[in-house]
Regions:
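Short beta-edge/loop segments at beta->alpha junctions of small alpha/beta modules
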Residues: 1-74
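Short gly/ser-rich loop at a beta-strand->alpha-helix junction or flexible surface loop bordering the NTP-binding
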Residues: 44-54, 68-114
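Hydrophobic alpha-helical interaction segments
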Residues: 123-198
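A short, charged helix-loop
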Residues: 114-122
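Short coil/loop linkers at secondary-structure junctions
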Residues: 28-29, 92, 177-179
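Basic Lys/Arg-rich amphipathic helical interaction modules
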Residues: 6-9, 113, 170
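Alpha-helix initiation and N-capping motif
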Residues: 1-4, 30, 65-66, 82, ...
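Charged, low-complexity, helix/coiled-coil-prone segments
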Residues: 22-34, 72-84, 95-100, 123-132, ...
Length: 198
């Protein structure tokens, strides 16, 4: 059995590996990685990042975003979000965006991983999963980056906020909102207040 065949025993379809992960099982890691990429066992996603794609009836499946991001960050504390999620809130957003936002504690910047765009944003805190309240707060945090009319979206967010669980929305605003967002929701939850995120 060759060293490359021994190395393959440690690899699992659907997983993403960093160069140092593979180095544990290889004495010539760069040569072995090059061989595995050339024969199609591994796919190079970015510098030092490789995927072992799952075979499906449609061909090779790309790695799941959470596995890809976890390997890239070397950390499992992150939240995958997308501006597309705002569309499900019923606040008048309809645009489709081709990037995924990754809230995390380590990296900041835009990265291309496996042919997909990820916008990494360092945040001091974020929830473990997306909630309606977090999405409303996140939308107001990022309202200037959206293609829709800011005032129309904010008016609908205020209407939607009135129907949310007050405690959960207050918690999300306090923990995840920027200063303007906190002011906006403080006003939005008061009856008859003018709504403005400026």
């Amino acid at each position: 059995m060759t060293k490359v065949q021994e190395l393959k025993k440690h690899l699992r379809p659907g997983q993403v590996y960093r160069r140092e992960d593979v180095a544990r099982w290889s004495n010539a890691v760069d040569r072995h990685l090059k061989q595995l990429v050339e024969e199609g066992t591994l796919t190079k996603l970015a510098g030092g990042l490789y995927a072992y794609p799952k075979e499906t009836v449609f061909g090779k499946a790309p790695p799941e975003d959470d596995k890809l991001v976890e390997a890239f960050l070397k950390d499992d504390r992150f939240l995958l979000a997308s501006p597309n999620a705002y569309n499900g809130l019923g606040v008048g957003t309809t645009q489709l965006y081709d990037k995924t936002v990754v809230y995390n504690h380590k990296r900041h910047g835009d990265f291309q991983l496996g042919g997909r765009r990820f916008a990494f944003r360092v945040k001091p805190s974020f929830p473990k999963s997306l909630t309606k309240e977090f999405l409303l707060v996140d939308l107001v945090n990022n309202v200037d980056q959206l293609a829709e009319s800011k005032q129309e979206v904010l008016a609908r967010v205020a209407e939607r906020a009135a129907s949310c669980d007050f405690r959960r929305l207050e918690y999300a605003t306090r923990n995840y909102g920027n200063v303007q967002t906190k002011k906006f929701f403080a006003n939005a939850l008061k009856p008859g207040a003018e709504l403005n995120a400026d």
